[in-house]
């Protein structure tokens, strides 16, 4: 019921105008699943031998799907089904199967479409064959934590080969072999750091302990139950 208009001026700047006061009417709104949350079980399946996972109702807006495109560039076996439009947004179910991943160089212009997914992408890269190079990720230093520094330190602690650069990480993967693990990772109260290392622990010889998982409730309150179910616990 709102009187709302969106216009783009000659310089390409969008102007959103809202005229109030309006009489708002209740509506049923179906919200697509978050691609950021979907990335965690998908990467867990990709790095764990014998695994296959289907995540349903994932939002596939092109501005948010960089993580899936880069995983596919690494050789990820991802299948899309039940593609449809929900609330004006493209949605699909994604099936991920264990895959032999290969390192890639991620173009900096892809970063905006997967900026929140880089922590779990780094985990995938640490298990891949060969070198993965990322750059243009300065924004990761000013998220809920310095995600470049924390991911580099954490991955090194569990046995990965990582070079931290000012605007990205260079990761030489394990070739699909499990990492050593067996250490406790500081999440720095960052939900994505905590979830990323929880997933990494699924493919480590001695597992991984995350010091504080409470921040996970910020974005994915059922994450621990989901990961336990996927692990057969």
What are these model-derived regions, one by one?
Residues 1-233:
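Short, structured segments at the rim of ligand-binding sites
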């Amino acid at each position: 019921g709102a009187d709302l208009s969106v216009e783009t001026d000659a310089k390409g700047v969008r102007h959103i105008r809202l005229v109030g006061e309006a009489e708002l009417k209740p509506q049923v709104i179906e919200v697509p699943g978050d691609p950021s949350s979907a990335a965690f079980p998908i990467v867990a399946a990709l790095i764990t031998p014998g695994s296959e996972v289907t995540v349903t109702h994932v939002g596939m807006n092109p501005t948010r799907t960089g993580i899936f495109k880069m995983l596919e560039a690494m050789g990820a076996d991802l299948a899309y089904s039940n593609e449809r439009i929900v609330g004006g947004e493209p949605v699909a179910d994604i099936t991920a199967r264990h895959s032999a991943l290969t390192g890639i160089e991620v173009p900096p212009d892809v970063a905006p479409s997967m900026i929140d997914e880089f922590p779990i992408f780094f985990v995938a890269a640490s298990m891949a064959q060969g070198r993965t190079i990322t750059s243009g990720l300065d924004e990761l230093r000013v998220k809920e934590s310095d995600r470049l520094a924390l991911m580099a330190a954490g991955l090194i602690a569990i046995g990965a080969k990582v070079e931290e650069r000012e605007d990205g990480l260079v990761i030489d993967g394990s070739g699909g072999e499990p990492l050593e693990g067996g250490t406790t990772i500081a999440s720095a109260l960052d939900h994505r750091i905590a979830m990323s290392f929880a997933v990494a622990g699924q493919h480590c010889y001695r597992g991984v302990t995350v010091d504080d998982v409470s921040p996970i409730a910020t974005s994915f309150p059922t994450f621990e139950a989901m990961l336990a179910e996927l692990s057969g616990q």
